């Protein structure tokens, strides 16, 4: 937003006093255009300022007249414009001073109201300052040229005309001294313009580094290249004027000017060699990567040489990089830190692209030589860099030029499990390093507010969302990293966080650092939850204790989504339920990882759970998550198959009360389907009894009431609430030779019925509370189990229990054929008859 965009939003009474010397309605017509002109940089009264002020007055009148025509204003305003033109025509610098005063007042008012000026305004002012300085330099060079020609003519008439062409020095100064002084002043202005360019290059480098953390970055180097080339043109013109002045300058003055100009050129040339495409800042050995450099003055100096110079890429340590930064230092040294393959590329001009660059497409770090580390520093805290270097000769004198550019610091890893900690090192360095630092020095402690900005920037960039973190999120993060449960934002406002707290110290009661946990959240959200976060469906960064305070007074079924505090890369659902005593309770469902959500999405999981009703505070879940539900396929697919799906259920830690049920008068048999129209026979012979338990004090007499074709049916009396299946599942047979499910009596394989989400019940069997397994268990009787390779016994029934079951089976079978089976009595747990014969009952499914 522009400065005027903020001023126009302010109450009129706060800015009305600024428009005493200039009508306020005309200021409205000028709008943003006014702040796009160099009013603040015309502070002199020389010929350059006067000429530019006259041009600005004409532009102002034209802009006002055009604005009046567009808005259909009346002749009254046109009359004001005409009056304005006539007033300032005699002294255009007065108009410059008036507008400068208005803009300064507007900036002050905006600072008081909004505490900051808009960033586009800063960039616009910086651009205006450089362009105005460049125009002044061009004007100065023109004055120098006129003065030098006048001096060389050596006529009195020439000296008289000189006063009308240029600003003459103080009284008593001759033309030669005036030329020398003008050259020195212009060289000083060139040095100031060079400083602006170098500062702008440093800002570009810093922005490039911050872009590694996700900051926006205008990476085009074309504006910077244009600035550098324009300064080189000014340098060339000044150098020609110094050389052409000849005897008009003293040798000492000429040598001083030549040295200053050469230093300007040297600094520009060496500063214009930049790493345009940075190598990966977390670099794995034996992995190909790319990088690129650009020489902003290549089109000016390299031309079309027969053999373009080669750019070489080498790995350097932090110590070697520090030596490179020292003027006239020893350089990087001969010792190699790492071997890079395919590390030379020619530096070539591209006329269509208007640039001079070298792109390394197939770099590969073959190996790395670790240097000595400081104290407890790990290998993922060791920073290196890639040094790009090239050399060529400049000008007719074949002046040797050495170009060097250092990449951003990078961390070399040899295994993927080092990636997380390496990213922490790079994040910290990118965020908190200073411009023009000694490589690669960075603060050990930083203000928590800066850390919040960094985490927010990284989160938005990594996830790919425009929804950043909220103040409540930062409060939770502060509590986590400082191990402080303060509930006030002000408690953390002036605190600082250390590198150790960020990624060296293990969080209290956990097995990971703060960054490792936060990076897990980043990865999970990026891979599975971007749309949910962007739709503000996830609170995310909130403690379990705060969740309880939010949900405890909400209706049953109210839920919210939060990132797991105890696991890396997990999200959990917290919801309100009623306990057995009727009091509200908060349950947190086991966290879902990225792998879990790749199997079934978060939205579909929420749809599966009927107990979830409203997203906190009061938004119906179907309204909130409908766009995230996967459409259900109806009918058969293209191959003729009926679609199957996986659905999620949740185990209750305390099962609901079970109504008292009655044992049926008949126990049905379960046909395995191994042979048509037949059932598995089971003879209880002495030779089939497993010797697992010591012999009972008494034994069961052999039972001969069943023929080999008849079945003995044994009811499972154990309830397994974790075996919960949705009602849409099909059937499958359980092989007879599989081990018996844990917690069930050995019996013939049967088709079990499950009512989800509650304990397992057979579809056509009701249960009594006093089952055979609720009786005291004594020694295991002989002659009971049919074979130890079929279903190994868990809890041995008594002789009385077995006899009762066998007699019931005999009496109800009707001499070998089962009679009519009773209907299933109503169950508290939901629908009955959901067959799970196709499921492995030994498993503990989560769906």
From Swiss-Prot:
The modification Phosphotyrosine is found at residue 641. Changing residue 419 to H: In HIES6; likely pathogenic; gain of function in interleukin-4-mediated signaling pathway; increased DNA-binding transcription factor activity; increased protein abundance in patient-derived fibroblasts. Pfam families: SH2, STAT6_C, STAT_alpha, STAT_bind, STAT_int, STAT_linker. The modification N-acetylserine is found at residue 2. Changing residue 419 to G: In HIES6; likely pathogenic; gain of function in interleukin-4-mediated signaling pathway; increased DNA-binding transcription factor activity; increased STAT6 phosphorylation at baseline and after stimulation with IL4. A motif (LXXLL motif) lies at residues 802-806. One of its GO terms (molecular function) is DNA-binding transcription activator activity, RNA polymerase II-specific. Changing residue 519 to H: In HIES6; likely pathogenic; increased DNA-binding transcription factor activity; increased STAT6 phosphorylation at baseline and after stimulation with IL4. Tyrosine phosphorylated on Tyr-641 following stimulation by IL4/interleukin-4. Tyrosine phosphorylated following stimulation by IL3/interleukin-3. Dephosphorylation on tyrosine residues by PTPN2 negatively regulates the IL4/interleukin-4 mediated signaling. GO terms for biological process: cell surface receptor signaling pathway via JAK-STAT; cytokine-mediated signaling pathway; defense response; growth hormone receptor signaling pathway via JAK-STAT; interleukin-4-mediated signaling pathway; isotype switching to IgE isotypes; mammary gland epithelial cell proliferation; mammary gland morphogenesis. Changing residue 419 to A: In HIES6; likely pathogenic; increased DNA-binding transcription factor activity; increased STAT6 phosphorylation at baseline and after stimulation with IL4. It comes from the Eukaryota. Residues 809-847 are annotated as: Disordered. Residues 517-632 form the SH2 domain. GO terms for cellular component: chromatin; cytoplasm; cytosol; nucleoplasm; nucleus; RNA polymerase II transcription regulator complex. Keywords: Acetylation, Activator, ADP-ribosylation, Cytoplasm, Disease variant, DNA-binding, Nucleus, Phosphoprotein, SH2 domain, Transcription, Transcription regulation. It is found in: Cytoplasm; Nucleus. Forms a homodimer or a heterodimer with a related family member. Interacts with NCOA1 via its C-terminal LXXLL motif. PANTHER family: SIGNAL TRANSDUCER AND ACTIVATOR OF TRANSCRIPTION (PTHR11801). Belongs to the transcription factor STAT family. This is Signal transducer and activator of transcription 6.
């Amino acid at each position: 937003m522009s400065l005027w965009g903020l001023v126009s939003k302010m109450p009129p009474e706060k800015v009305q006093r600024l428009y005493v010397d200039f009508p306020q309605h005309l200021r409205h017509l000028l709008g943003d255009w006014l702040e796009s002109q160099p009013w603040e940089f015309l502070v002199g009264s020389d010929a350059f300022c006067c000429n530019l002020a006259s041009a600005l007055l004409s532009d102002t009148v034209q802009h006002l007249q055009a604005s009046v025509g567009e808005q259909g204003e009346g002749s009254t305003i046109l009359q004001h414009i005409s009056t304005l033109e006539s007033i300032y025509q005699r002294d255009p610098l007065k108009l410059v001073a008036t507008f400068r005063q208005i803009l300064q007042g507007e900036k002050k008012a905006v600072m008081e109201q909004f505490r900051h000026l808009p960033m586009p305004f800063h960039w616009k002012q910086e651009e205006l300052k450089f362009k105005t300085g460049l125009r002044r330099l061009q004007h100065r060079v023109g004055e120098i040229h006129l003065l030098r020609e006048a001096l060389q003519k050596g006529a009195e008439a020439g000296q008289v005309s000189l006063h009308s062409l240029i600003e003459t020095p103080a009284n008593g100064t001759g033309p030669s001294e005036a030329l020398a002084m003008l050259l020195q002043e212009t060289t000083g202005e060139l040095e100031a313009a060079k400083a602006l360019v170098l500062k702008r290059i440093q800002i570009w480098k810093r922005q490039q580094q911050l872009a590694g953390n996700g900051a926006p970055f205008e990476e085009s180097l074309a504006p910077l290249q244009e600035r550098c080339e324009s300064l080189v043109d000014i340098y060339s013109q000044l150098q020609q004027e110094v050389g052409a002045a000849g005897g008009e300058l003293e040798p000492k003055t000429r040598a001083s000017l030549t040295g200053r100009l050469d230093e300007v050129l040297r600094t520009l040339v060496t500063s214009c060699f930049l790493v345009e495409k940075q190598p990966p800042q977390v670099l794995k050995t034996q992995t190909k990567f790319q990088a690129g450099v650009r020489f902003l003055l290549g089109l000016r100096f390299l031309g079309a040489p027969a053999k373009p110079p080669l750019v070489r890429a080498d790995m350097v340590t932090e110590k070697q990089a520090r030596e490179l930064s020292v003027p006239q230092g020893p350089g990087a040294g001969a010792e190699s830190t790492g071997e890079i393959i395919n590390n030379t590329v020619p530096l070539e001009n591209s006329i269509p692209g208007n640039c001079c660059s070298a792109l390394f497409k197939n770099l590969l770090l073959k190996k790395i030589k670790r240097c000595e580390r400081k104290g407890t520093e790990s290998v993922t805290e060791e920073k290196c860099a890639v040094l790009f270097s090239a050399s060529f000769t400049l000008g007719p004198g074949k002046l040797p030029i050495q170009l060097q550019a250092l990449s951003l610091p990078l961390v070399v890893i040899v295994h993927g499990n080092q990636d997380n900690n390496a990213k922490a090192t790079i994040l910290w360095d990118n965020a908190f390093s200073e411009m023009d630092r000694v490589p690669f020095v960075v603060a050990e402690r930083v203000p928590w507010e800066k850390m919040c900005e960094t985490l927010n920037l990284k989160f938005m960039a990594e996830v790919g969302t425009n929804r950043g973190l909220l103040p409540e999120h930062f409060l939770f993060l502060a509590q986590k990293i400082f191990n402080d449960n303060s509930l006030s934002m002000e408690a953390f406002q002036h605190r600082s966080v250390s590198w150790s707290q960020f990624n060296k110290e293990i969080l209290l009661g956990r097995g990971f650092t703060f960054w490792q946990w936060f990076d897990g959240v980043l990865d999970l959200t990026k891979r599975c939850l971007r749309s949910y976060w962007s739709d503000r469906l996830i609170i995310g960064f909130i403690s379990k204790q705060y969740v309880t305070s939010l949900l405890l007074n909400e209706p049953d079924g109210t839920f919210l989504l939060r990132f797991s505090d105890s696991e890396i890369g997990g999200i959990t659902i917290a919801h309100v339920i009623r306990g057995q005593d009727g009091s509200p309770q908060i349950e947190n469902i086991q966290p879902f990882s990225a792998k879990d959500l790749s199997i079934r999405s978060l939205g579909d999981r929420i749809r599966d759970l009927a107990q979830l009703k409203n997203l906190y505070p009061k938004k119906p879940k179907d309204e909130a998550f409908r766009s995230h539900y996967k459409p259900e396929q109806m009918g058969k697919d293209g191959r003729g198959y009926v679609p199957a799906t996986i659905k999620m259920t949740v185990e209750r830690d305390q099962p609901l009360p079970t109504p008292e049920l009655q044992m049926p008068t008949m126990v049905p048999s379960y046909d395995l389907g191994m042979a048509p129209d037949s059932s598995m026979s089971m003879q209880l012979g002495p030779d089939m009894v497993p010797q697992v338990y010591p012999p009972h004090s008494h034994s069961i007499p052999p039972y001969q009431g069943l023929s080999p074709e008849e079945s003995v049916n044994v009811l499972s009396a154990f309830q397994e609430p974790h075996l919960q299946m949705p009602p849409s599942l099909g059937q499958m047979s359980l092989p007879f030779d599989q081990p018996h499910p844990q917690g069930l009596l050995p019996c013939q394989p049967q088709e079990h019925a499950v009512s989800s989400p509650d304990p397992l019940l057979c579809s056509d069997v009701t249960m009594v509370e006093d089952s055979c397994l609720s009786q005291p268990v004594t020694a295991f009787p002989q002659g009971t189990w049919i074979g130890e390779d079929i279903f190994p016994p868990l809890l041995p029934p008594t002789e009385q229990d077995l006899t009762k079951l066998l007699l019931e089976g005999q009496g109800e079978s009707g001499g070998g054929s089962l009679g009519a089976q009773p209907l299933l009595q109503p169950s508290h747990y939901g629908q009955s008859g959901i067959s799970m014969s196709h499921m492995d009952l030994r498993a503990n499914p989560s769906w």
